[in-house]
């Protein structure tokens, strides 16, 4: 059986789909999987060994050039390639109109959430089989349940395995006990203040750990340079391809991150990960894993560096006690 997964974005949503793929790999060894994803996240999808072929879309870029002939040539080529693959089933795991339209291009039966479960009920008009999955569950569990219903097995929800390992990469000059500080995030209301990141870096050095940080745009660069300027032992990694950053994250001792896709990647690798959530509900989309913890800003309170460090110490102690 040949199945196409459609989960185009965001990075966190893509990573939240990995446990469902791992369930399916174990329960349905007769099924092969391809994946259709935004071009920016193809390298993330490639981390899972069960994915045979990756098809990329560029919906974000296409929207900015709808009248451009190149846009329509790319979209037409994608439709042709998907149909040539002759899929037996498409699992549309995003529940959005845009992803449903992408799924439709494959010309195969589509399975997805029903109207009460999909994020955009109009997407279900394009599905051939729909399944009820409560919306108040975490995104990881919702996707695992959907895959199980679509492929005919019961996932073991008492266990969680993303099925991915850190990639090999250039981590020259980065060794010892390191803590990667993932301060960058797409929304202003998700950003922990720069002074808190600086104080966290200082506290890490006091505990004989080396802070590591990086950036992906000019605003993030200013924060990264502020951390490195205030705490000189910080390793400042220049803006780098996603695969290289993933390799450095994967070989870190500890991750402290904002609500951002790379924080989810760290928890999927099984690393001690402390996420600082300031604006979103972690019960539905927060990092999950044996060594993942989320600190949520309560009304009228703030997440302090001291609270973050206390949480990191708990996770590191838990990891130390774990069997090899």
What does each model-identified segment do?
Residues 1-324:
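Catalytic machinery of carbohydrate-active enzymes
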């Amino acid at each position: 059986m040949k199945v196409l997964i459609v989960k185009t974005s965001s990075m966190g949503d893509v990573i939240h789909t990995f446990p469902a793929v791992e369930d399916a790999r174990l329960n349905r060894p007769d099924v092969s999987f391809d994946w259709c994803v935004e071009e920016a996240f193809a390298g993330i999808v490639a981390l899972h060994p069960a994915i045979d072929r990756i098809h990329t879309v560029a919906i974000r870029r296409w929207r900015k050039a709808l009248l451009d002939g190149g846009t329509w040539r790319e979209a037409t080529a994608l439709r042709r390639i998907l149909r040539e693959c002759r899929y037996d089933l498409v699992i549309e795991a995003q529940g959005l109109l845009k992803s449903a339209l992408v799924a439709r291009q494959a010309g195969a039966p589509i399975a997805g959430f029903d109207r009460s479960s999909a994020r955009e009920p109009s997407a279900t008009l394009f599905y051939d089989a729909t399944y009820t999955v409560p919306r108040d569950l975490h995104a990881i569990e919702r996707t695992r349940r959907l895959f199980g219903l679509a492929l005919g097995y019961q996932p073991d929800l008492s266990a969680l395995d993303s099925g991915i390992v850190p990639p090999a990469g250039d981590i020259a000059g980065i060794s010892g006990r390191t803590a990667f500080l993932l301060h960058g995030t797409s929304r202003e209301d998700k950003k922990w203040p720069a002074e808190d990141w600086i104080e966290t870096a200082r506290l890490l050095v006091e505990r004989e750990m080396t802070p590591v940080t990086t950036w992906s745009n000019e605003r993030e660069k200013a924060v990264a340079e502020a951390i490195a300027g205030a705490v000189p032992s910080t390793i400042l990694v220049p803006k780098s391809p996603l695969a290289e950053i993933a390799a450095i994250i994967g070989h870190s001792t500890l991750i402290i991150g904002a609500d951002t896709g790379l924080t989810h990647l760290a928890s999927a690798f099984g690393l001690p990960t402390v996420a600082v959530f300031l604006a979103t509900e972690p019960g539905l989309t927060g990092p999950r894993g044996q060594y993942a913890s989320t600190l949520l800003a309560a009304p009228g309170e703030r997440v302090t560096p001291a609270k973050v460090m206390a949480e990191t110490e708990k996770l590191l102690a838990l990891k130390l006690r774990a069997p090899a």
